[in-house]
A protein has these predicted regions:
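Active-site neighborhoods of divalent-metal-dependent phosphate/nucleic-acid chemistry enzymes
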Residues: 72-121
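Short, well-structured N-terminal submotif of metal-dependent ribonuclease cores
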Residues: 1-43, 49-65
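Phosphate- and divalent-cation-binding pockets in alpha/beta enzyme and binding domains
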Residues: 17, 46, 83, 132
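Acidic, PIN/NYN-like endoribonuclease modules and their adjacent C-terminal/linker elements
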Residues: 1-4, 112-145
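Helix-adjacent hinge/juxtasegments
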Residues: 63-75
């Protein structure tokens, strides 16, 4: 990843880190990029929805509280919601075979638009959905590898 570039991690990167624990290199890699990292409120909501155990809830709270405390929480504004609707409508129109997938793309679309708005790169393990979105909206994307 380029030095000095803002990063916005997709939910799956945090989930992998939380599942693997603090001794694994994945969380260490996340910590190393914290000075360049924003957290999308959409990702925070997905993390909270998926945190079942008290330990998981505590870890998610730590991440979200850090982002809020240092001013690194990014939330889609009204215009982003409208653009997301336009993007998803265009996908339905141009690629009708993906019609059933469109409802599952809302959050990823909002994440991509938030990243674009702040000049960040989306980092994800879910390249397929984000590559689809890149056919309809410009944003920077990198695999988490």
């Amino acid at each position: 990843m380029r030095t000095g570039r803002w990063l916005l991690y997709d939910t799956n990167v945090y989930v992998s880190a939380l599942r693997q624990g603090s001794l694994d290199p994945l969380p260490r890699r996340l910590r190393e990029t914290l000075p360049r990292t924003y957290l999308a409120s959409v990702v925070a909501a997905e993390l909270r929805a998926g945190a079942i155990t008290e330990a998981a809830k505590r870890k998610v709270r730590e991440v979200t509280q850090w982002a809020q405390r240092v001013g690194r929480m990014v939330t889609p504004e009204a215009g982003a919601w409208e653009r997301a609707g336009d993007v998803l409508g265009k996908i339905r129109q141009v690629e009708p075979h993906l019609r059933s997938k469109v409802p599952r793309l809302w959050n990823d679309t909002l994440i991509a638009l938030c990243a674009r708005d702040i000049g960040a790169t989306v980092v994800t393990e879910n390249l397929q959905d984000f590559e689809l979105l890149r056919r309809y909206v410009r944003f920077d994307l990198r695999p988490f590898a």
